[in-house]
Amino acid sequence: DCLGWFKGCDPDNDKCCEGYKCNRRDKWCKYKLW
């Protein structure tokens, strides 16, 4: 199961959904804009 918008995540084990990226500072899944 992947993590969606603003779900807590681990930047070293990024389980965010397609199109999202774990934000290292906030430890949340956010839209990947790049």
From Swiss-Prot:
<feature type="disulfide bond">
    <location>
        <begin position="9"/>
        <end position="22"/>
    </location>
</feature>
<keyword id="KW-0964">Secreted</keyword>
<keyword id="KW-0960">Knottin</keyword>
<keyword id="KW-0872">Ion channel impairing toxin</keyword>
<dbReference type="InterPro" id="IPR011696">
    <property type="entry name" value="Huwentoxin-1"/>
</dbReference>
<keyword id="KW-0632">Potassium channel impairing toxin</keyword>
<dbReference type="GO" id="GO:0017080">
    <property type="term" value="F:sodium channel regulator activity"/>
</dbReference>
<keyword id="KW-1015">Disulfide bond</keyword>
<keyword id="KW-0738">Voltage-gated sodium channel impairing toxin</keyword>
<keyword id="KW-0528">Neurotoxin</keyword>
<feature type="disulfide bond">
    <location>
        <begin position="16"/>
        <end position="29"/>
    </location>
</feature>
<dbReference type="GO" id="GO:0005576">
    <property type="term" value="C:extracellular region"/>
</dbReference>
<dbReference type="InterPro" id="IPR013140">
    <property type="entry name" value="Huwentoxin_CS1"/>
</dbReference>
<dbReference type="Pfam" id="PF07740">
    <property type="entry name" value="Toxin_12"/>
</dbReference>
<keyword id="KW-0800">Toxin</keyword>
<dbReference type="GO" id="GO:0015459">
    <property type="term" value="F:potassium channel regulator activity"/>
</dbReference>
<dbReference type="GO" id="GO:0008200">
    <property type="term" value="F:ion channel inhibitor activity"/>
</dbReference>
<feature type="disulfide bond">
    <location>
        <begin position="2"/>
        <end position="17"/>
    </location>
</feature>
<dbReference type="GO" id="GO:0090729">
    <property type="term" value="F:toxin activity"/>
</dbReference>
<comment type="similarity">
    <text>Belongs to the neurotoxin 10 (Hwtx-1) family. 61 (VSTX3) subfamily.</text>
</comment>
<comment type="function">
    <text>Potent voltage-gated sodium channel blocker (IC(50)=190 nM and 210 nM on human and rat Nav1.3/SCN3A respectively, 430 nM on human Nav1.7/SCN9A, 770 nM and 290 nM on human and rat Nav1.8/SCN10A respectively). Binds the voltage-sensor domain of the potassium channel KvAP (from Aeropyrum pernix) and weakly inhibits this channel.</text>
</comment>
<protein>
    <recommendedName>
        <fullName>Voltage sensor toxin 3</fullName>
    </recommendedName>
</protein>
